[in-house]
Amino acid sequence: MGQSQDNTQLTTASPQAEKDLSSNDNPPESEPAAPKKGARFWLVFIAIALTTFLAALDTSIISTALPTITSDLGSNSLYVWIVDSYLLASTATIPIFAQAANIYGRRSLTLIAVCLFTLGSGLCGGAHNTAMMIGGRSVQGVGGGGILTMSEIVVCDMVSVRERGMYAGIIGGVWAIASVIAPIMGGAFAQNVSWRWIFYINLPIAGVVLVALIVFLKLARPPTGTFKEQMSRIDWGGSVLLIASVTAVVLALSWGGSEHPWSSWRTLVPLILGLVGQLAFFAYQGAPWLKEPTMPLRLFGNRTSSTLFVISFVHSMLLFWVCYFLPVYFQAVKEASPARSAVMLFPIATTSAPGGVIAGIFITKTGKYRVWHFVGFALMSISCGLFTLLDDKSSIGRWVGFQLLFGFGTGFVFTSCLPPILASLPDSDVATATGAWTFLRNFGSIWGIAIPAAAFNTRVNSSLDKVSSGTVRDMLVNGGAYEHATKTFIQAFNNTPRLKAEIVQVYMDGLKLVWQVSIAFSVLGFVLAFLVKSLTLRDELNTEYGLEEKDTSKEKSSEEGNAS
């Protein structure tokens, strides 16, 4: 697969370019071996996995219950912010948590993230109006973004670079399973108990996790100065630029094709301002006076890390692309209920998780990761091509088989990206690099909904001349087709089979373009994989923030719980 055979051993002393980092053939004698994994390690890892499960649940658990929530609270057109407020808050705060983890320590930031998520869950569960719900979702989103960031950082601090693929695969599997079962849980709570339990269910689980983290998450923390010195290290300007630019982009992508046409100034102005703001953010990150930027440009200073950041963005975009538009096919073409369509996505969840673990184990055993980029994107490209064949007559075997290919492919790619990113950078950049990786994945998910939505709406608009009813054409134009992609809407035309067939054909036309465009991005990921270099993933663990050893904690480090 074009994999080089260099026996690169990385050092961690300085943020050199990749060429410099990969020049040493022998590991430094002072580099410590990875500690054995005792009961405390596994208790912390399980707690981290549970927090990831909760954060993943709340990205999509309200999707099937949203009509019930909006009806109960009288949200009307504000319903979209019940979803977008969480996504916006979590995405914008990810790099900020990553930088703060280097200043205030991993333990304190992890506990803060879980506490904010729990507080937000309580506010949402007790919400009596839309404003309180949106506020609660925003608080929950900040906590969720912190959980995603800190869980990856803490795991990276506990295991060596070579092992990170396997543990990332497990965390990724937890995420995939939670994302698929979330809509089913949301619908079940809304129909059988109360939609409020969608949020209340987080409280006891988060409480147990919080206790476990307080008791067992004892991490080393190097001295970081006084409170004033710590505050002066925060990149306030970069944080403001990042939050403002991400907010503008999310607003534009939320409005485009639904609230306002894509050609409307109300969509274009915030989109352009947001993209310009992000360029300004990266320009500011390179300012010579900025000692500790939120997202240092050195993270993108070598070919391997910069390429893998782009690959991770594309991969996340494709994952959300498929998971948001297969339900449109299931509900509008195959006439499945929302809960049933969530179940029909199980093939992706049941293969992406084991696929990630398989790739992670292979990477841990051999240190080879490039092959998984090629295999993963090859499977994703093939499956996206096969999705174009789906129609109203497709058998269960077809849509299940196509998803199995995509699921394994996405699992392979997810697990094999972060370890080589960290291998190409010094260990001092673990937190910021992991934060950048998580941010780009979240940001990619936003585009993974917006781009196919634009393609779908464009093709639907051009295909509406096939629909004989002017009333129905008005219902489906300019984003209406996505809104009406439900079993109830389609079956309302059972008494007019010709009109129903015309409507279904419009949906199939729109979805075909969605899958055709996805092929291009899948192939792009495959091509980008050729730019990734083969680096040695070291077995040693060299970090200042790992789990404290009982016999050395008093002499070499101070517990975060006792600091500041």
From Swiss-Prot:
Residues 1-35 are annotated as: Disordered. It is a multi-pass membrane protein. Coiled coil: none annotated. Glycans are attached at N192, N302, N461. GO terms for cellular component: plasma membrane. Keywords: Glycoprotein, Membrane, Transmembrane, Transmembrane helix, Transport. MFS-type efflux pump; part of the gene cluster that mediates the biosynthesis of the mycotoxin lucilactaene and the lucilactaene-related compound NG-391 that act as cell cycle inhibitors with potent growth inhibitory activity against malarial parasites, moderate growth inhibitory activity against cancer cells, and no activity against bacteria and fungi. This is MFS-type efflux pump LUC4.
